[in-house]
């Protein structure tokens, strides 16, 4: 009677090899997931870095036509969402020829003086203008706000002419508008007074600093003043051009989505993060379930002893040439040992 035993060491080796294969698969999956997430965060950090491209201009910079020397775009002078940097030129021109005709309302000029001021969206700007004449009192005020600019100028001639001028400007978004206006002016000569009174001019300048906001409204103003003397009467005509613009809501949204023109937008980064996180978790869960089922189906139930019945092999060399197990009830169990 032969007594055969199964090599438990071989079974243990096969079980351990299967276990090591499963652990290796899990390690590979976790490593791939970590590399994917790391790449995503590196790309997100790279996309958040500012990209300075001086060859192109973002779409929210509105061109301004019809102005001379009013606009000076510089990347160091504007914030995100701002319109740009404007230089506003104010010209005061006085008639110097002998023609005192006032029929056209606008007079040619032969001399001019220029005052330049630079408003910005984050600091207060001051504009001062002074003008003196023997028979004129001039008051000029300039108020800068985030929504509009107002220019009020009044000239009074003493003793024989009164000229009133008022101008109010408006801002329009998102287009750029140039408004030129001349107010009503009345001349009331008074010949009863022959006294010449010399009055010094008074100039008042006031400014208020604008409040910074994400959508900044910027405006520039160009003022030209013409003056002429007609039979002892001083006639002043002021022409004011106001250019105001502000970025629209669609431009602001496009700037947020483009994120300085490089990489994925904010919404796309959120979508990619959700897809990577949820998809990676589902993939790891499926692999874990498959590995568990495979391990469960491959369990070995071959432990213990295996007996052969007597004279079952009949001298054959084939290993499985008999019935496994002691199943013959007539067999003597004691003879097997």
UniProtKB/Swiss-Prot annotation:
Motif, Glycophorin A: chain positions: 273-277
Keywords, sorted A to Z: Cell membrane, Cell wall, Glycoprotein, Membrane, Secreted, Transmembrane, Transmembrane helix, Virulence
Main location: membrane
Glycosylated residues in this chain: 53, 65, 87, 100
Record note on disruption phenotype: Shows defects in invasion of agar medium and attenuated virulence in a murine model of disseminated candidiasis. Leads to hypersensibility to the glucan synthase inhibitor capsofungin and the cell wall disturbing agents Congo red and calcofluor white.
Domain of life, source organism: Eukaryota
Topological domain ranges for the Cytoplasmic compartment: 1-21, 291-337
GO cellular component, one term: membrane
Topological domains, Extracellular: 43-269
A GO MF label: calmodulin binding
Modification after translation, per record: Cross-linked to the carbohydrate polymers of the cell wall. O-glycosylated by MNT1 and MNT2. Also N-glycosylated.
Motif Calmodulin-binding per record, residues: 301-314
Compositional bias per record (Low complexity), positions renumbered to this chain: 124-220, 241-259
Annotated transmembrane regions: 22-42, 270-290
Stretches for region Disordered: 124-224, 241-265
Membrane topology of the entry: Multi-pass membrane protein
Locations listed in the record: Cell membrane; Cell septum; Secreted, Cell wall
Entry's Gene Ontology BP terms: calcium-mediated signaling; cell adhesion; invasive filamentous growth; MAPK cascade
Domain notes per entry: The GxxxG glycophorin motif in the transmembrane domain is required for CEK1 activation and subsequent invasive filamentation on agar medium. The cytoplasmic C-terminal calmodulin-binding motif (residues 301 to 317) is important for CEK1 activation and subsequent invasive filamentation on agar medium.
Family according to the record: Belongs to the MID2 like cell wall stress sensor family.
Function, as annotated: Cell-surface associated glycoprotein that acts as a plasma membrane receptor-type protein which senses the presence of matrix. Binds to calmodulin in response to environmental conditions and initiates a signaling cascade that activates CEK1, thus promoting invasive filamentation. Involved in the maintenance of the cell wall.
Designated name of the protein: Cell-surface associated glycoprotein DFI1
Organism: Candida albicans (strain SC5314 / ATCC MYA-2876) (Yeast)
Lineage: Eukaryota, Fungi, Dikarya, Ascomycota, Saccharomycotina
Gene this chain is encoded by: DFI1
């Amino acid at each position: 009677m032969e007594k055969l035993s199964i090599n438990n060491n071989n079974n243990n080796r096969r079980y351990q090899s299967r276990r090591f294969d499963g652990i290796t698969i899990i390690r590979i999956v976790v490593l791939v997931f970590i590399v994917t997430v790391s790449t995503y965060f590196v790309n997100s950090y790279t996309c958040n870095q500012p990209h300075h491209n001086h060859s192109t201009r973002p779409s929210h910079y509105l061109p301004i036509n019809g102005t001379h020397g009013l606009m000076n775009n510089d990347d160091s002078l504007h914030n995100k969402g701002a319109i740009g940097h404007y230089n506003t030129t104010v010209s005061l021109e006085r008639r110097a020829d002998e023609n005192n005709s006032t029929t056209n309302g606008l007079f040619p000029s032969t001399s001019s003086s220029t005052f330049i001021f630079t408003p910005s969206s984050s600091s207060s700007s001051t504009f001062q203008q002074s003008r003196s004449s023997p028979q004129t009192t001039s008051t000029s005020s300039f108020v800068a706000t985030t929504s509009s600019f107002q220019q009020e100028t009044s000239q009074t001639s003493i003793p024989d002419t009164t000229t009133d001028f008022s101008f109010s400007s408006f801002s329009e978004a998102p287009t750029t508008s140039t408004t030129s206006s001349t107010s009503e002016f009345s001349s009331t000569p008074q010949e009863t007074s022959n006294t010449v009174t010399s009055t010094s001019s008074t100039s008042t300048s006031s400014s208020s600093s604008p409040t910074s906001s994400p959508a900044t409204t910027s405006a520039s103003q160009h003022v030209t003043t013409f003056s002429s003397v007609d039979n002892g009467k001083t006639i002043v005509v002021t022409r004011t051009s106001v250019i105001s613009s502000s970025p629209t809501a669609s431009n602001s949204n496009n700037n947020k989505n483009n994120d300085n023109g490089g990489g994925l937008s904010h919404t796309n980064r959120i979508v990619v993060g959700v897809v990577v996180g949820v998809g990676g978790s589902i993939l790891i869960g499926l692999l874990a379930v498959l590995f568990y089922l495979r391990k469960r189906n491959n369990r070995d139930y071959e432990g213990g002893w295996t007996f052969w019945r007597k004279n079952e092999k009949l001298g054959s060399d084939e290993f499985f040439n008999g019935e496994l197990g002691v199943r013959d009830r007539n067999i003597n169990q004691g003879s097997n040992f």
